[in-house]
Amino acid sequence: AITRFMQWEPPRSLAAFAEVWQSWLAPIQDGSDLHFVVRALADARCLGLVGLHAAKTVCPELGIWIREDAQGNGIGQEAIAAVAEWASEALEPNCFEYPVAERNVASRRIAERLGGVIVGSRSNPKYNAVVYRIPNLRR
């Protein structure tokens, strides 16, 4: 399932999800969290999202989810690279952090293709993660 490598379980109801998305509003409004919709060029359907969290820091965090029927086509790589390139120029961070589930080989490849190296690890209730540091792509 698409939520297998998300850090949290999806809310069980629309009411529960309302609580979750409402907590996202303040960081979106103050510009510290940015979210980009990944759309198909042919028909503009939503393929996923890329998040840039702690965007105003020297090392913002990248995150991504791509719908299952669109995975395996390089869309995640293209989307993360596009956001990292834009942010490298527009926000001028030193680097990006990209936490990835240890078993999420496809997402690990995204980081590695962008010059990312493992700098740490994290544990959460669903899985263990490695944290990649991706350099500013404009330097």
Give the residues covered by each predicted segment.
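Acyl-donor (CoA/ACP) binding surface of acyl/acetyltransferases
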Residues: A1-F5, H35-R139
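Conserved GNAT-fold acetyl-CoA-binding loop/helix
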Residues: T3-S23, L34-F36
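Alpha-helix initiation/capping motif
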Residues: P10-S13, P27, G72, V100
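Short, P/G- and charge-enriched loop/turn segments at secondary-structure junctions
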Residues: S23-A26, V119-G120
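Short loop/turn motifs at secondary-structure junctions and domain boundaries
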Residues: A26-S32
